[in-house]
From Swiss-Prot:
UniProt protein name: Membrane protein insertase YidC
Protein transport among keywords: yes
Intracellular or extracellular location(s): Cell inner membrane
Highest taxon above the source species: Bacteria
UniProt keyword list: Cell inner membrane, Cell membrane, Chaperone, Membrane, Protein transport, Transmembrane, Transmembrane helix, Transport
Bias (Polar residues) ranges: 54-63
Biological processes annotated in GO: protein insertion into membrane; protein transport
Membrane topology note: Multi-pass membrane protein
Organism: Maridesulfovibrio salexigens (strain ATCC 14822 / DSM 2638 / NCIMB 8403 / VKM B-1763) (Desulfovibrio salexigens)
Keyword Heme among record annotations: no
The gene coding this protein: yidC
Family affiliation: Belongs to the OXA1/ALB3/YidC family. Type 1 subfamily.
Length: 539
């Protein structure tokens, strides 16, 4: 077995894996913290732009008094993390803008809105009772006013409504230091016959990504006893949607970077998800016994924000499991931690990637040393191997037998040269997954402008290099590395090996620039190591 053939096989396998990723990307009760709560009082000031009454002192849900209508009143919630607008008619979420995330890298870009255009038509955070859209029926009022939360404070808004003989109270609690919203619902059957009914908590949003984005699709996901389940096929979501019954810890609409999740408080629900008019909708429905004049209490939590593991870990239902890197999860997550550690000292993710590359190279240095040594030994055996090929001709069995004896005699491992490459493949794909699925790297720049120009260059390490400079340089370094590698005796193998840099360059054109920077720097370090090895051999 020829060492160069093994390396060629590994390189081609690597190219196939990269090509596959390029052409077919993957389709994939909590105790309240001891915090100071700010419950908005009816006499708090309300912005003059908000229509409707300044305050409504509403009766207790158990009361038979009529509720004063406050239809159309828009209440705002301001925290350091987001700005939300809640409509008093049913407690609908009109907008939820993330203050720390921009829609694009442009300086005047608006904040990311987790609701988006036209999604209000599908009633985000709408409550459905026995199939009735509660926000579109009955009379609603509210208690409280605009909230402005800082530190670790909590704030509460209360919405009460009479809908088809039911008295409903929705109590929404907002967290200043998280994107979490906790909801407690009380329902009293005032005039309907006793019996079983249904309540569904819902949310909806526009597509979080471009419809044709294969690498970062908008998905409907849920987590049950079997683990994480995802559906991103738009045809499936439009035509039939998805349904899951039983113990569903949470359901969500998400992308690589953002998520809208609802976490039902019930042990058993029916989760439904669908794409309607380009709006993604999910609902978690549960059965409830509505005996007349008996109060029923229900609960649900929402999270509308970035895929931030630390913040999501504070949400019930193991929501942090939504961050999943697939097969390479065990590698990608430590790489994310390492990148974050380097970033806290460099304040630049590009530099953090370079430092991480150096650390990885140092860890692989002994193996690479053995690899280059093995390749040099194989190079010295080439004349003897050529004689064996000439001697045995087409007798492959005899040729292989004598070659194995030759390797044994000179203590050479024919597969030794490919070991570092094999070990780097999972690291490569782990970093690929990390760059594509870590919100901290979204819009993270390295060299914002091309030096000495005002041309935007590496302004987003999660996106491709718009000028294609780094993949071309990466290909050039790979070509140089091939030229320095001891050549194979087979001319055909030599030609294929020299052609590989062109194949890799083509595939890397649309890869995240952060990943290209990693591979380019890795090539440069490999060239330096190989040069040192060659110099030592000559000496």
């Amino acid at each position: 077995m020829d060492n160069k053939r093994v390396i060629l096989a590994v390189a081609l396998s690597f190219a196939v894996l990269l090509g596959w990723q390029f052409l077919f990307p993957p389709q994939p009760q909590q105790p309240a913290p001891a915090q100071q709560e700010q419950t908005a009082q009816p006499n708090q000031a309300v912005d003059s732009s908000v229509a409707g009454p300044v305050s409504n002192q509403l009766p207790d849900p158990a009361s038979t008094s009529a509720i004063v209508s406050a239809k159309g009143t828009r209440l705002t919630v301001e925290t350091p993390l987001y700005s939300a607008v809640i409509n008093s008619q049913g407690g609908l979420l009109e907008s939820f803008k993330l203050k720390k995330f921009k829609a694009t890298i442009d300086a005047d870009s608006p904040d990311v809105d987790m609701v988006g255009t036209n999604a209000l038509d599908k009633a985000p955070m709408g409550l459905i009772l026995n199939g009735i859209a509660t926000w579109a029926n009955g009379v609603w009022g509210y208690e409280g006013a605009n909230l402005n939360l800082e530190g670790d404070k909590l704030g509460t808004l209360i919405f009460r409504g009479d809908v088809e003989g039911f008295r409903i109270e929705r109590r929404l609690t907002f967290h200043a230091d998280n994107y979490l919203i906790d909801e407690d619902v009380r329902v009293i059957n005032k005039s309907n016959p006793s019996g079983m009914g249904r309540i569904a908590f819902t949310t909806a949003t526009k597509s979080l990504t471009a419809a044709d984005d294969r690498y970062n699709p908008t998905r409907i996901a849920w987590f049950n006893a079997e683990g994480l389940v995802e559906e991103s096929d738009r045809d499936t979501l439009s035509e039939t949607g998805v349904t899951e019954s039983g113990k569903v810890e949470w359901a969500a609409i998400d992308s690589n970077y953002f998520i809208l999740a609802l976490v039902p408080g019930a042990d058993s629900v029916t989760m439904k998800g669908k794409l309607q008019d380009d709006i993604f909708r999910i609902a978690a429905e549960q059965n409830v016994s509505f005996d007349k004049d008996i109060e029923r209490k229900l609960a649900c939590s929402y999270y509308f924000g970035p895929m931030d593991a630390q913040l999501m870990a504070k949400v019930p239902g193991e929501l942090s499991k939504a961050i999943d890197f697939g097969w390479f999860d065990i590698i990608a997550k430590p790489l994310v931690v390492a990148l974050e550690w380097f970033h806290q000292y460099t304040n630049n993710y590009g530099i953090a990637i370079i430092l991480l590359t150096i650390v990885i190279k140092i860890l692989f240095w002994p193996l690479s040393h053995k690899s280059y040594k093995s390749m040099e030994q194989m190079k010295r055996l080439q004349p003897m191997m050529a004689k064996l090929r000439e001697k045995h001709g087409d007798d492959r069995e005899a040729l292989n037998k004598e070659m194995m004896q030759l390797y044994k005699t000179y203590n050479v491992n024919p597969a030794g040269g490919c070991l570092p490459m094999l070990l780097q493949i999972p690291v490569f794909f782990g970093l690929y997954k990390a760059l594509m699925g870590t919100v901290a790297l979204r819009h993270a720049d390295f060299v914002h402008f091309l030096p000495f120009t005002d041309i935007v260059w590496l302004a987003d390490l999660s996106a491709k290099d718009p000028l294609y400079i780094t993949p071309i340089v990466m290909g050039a370094t790979m070509f140089l590395q091939q030229k320095m590698t001891p050549s194979a005796g087979d001319p055909t193998q030599q030609k294929i090996m020299m052609f590989l840099p062109l194949v890799f360059t083509f595939m890397f054109l649309n890869f995240p620039s952060g990943l290209v920077v990693y591979w380019m720097v890795n090539n440069v370090l490999s060239i330096a190591q190989q040069w040192m090895m060659m110099r030592n051999v000559k000496n």
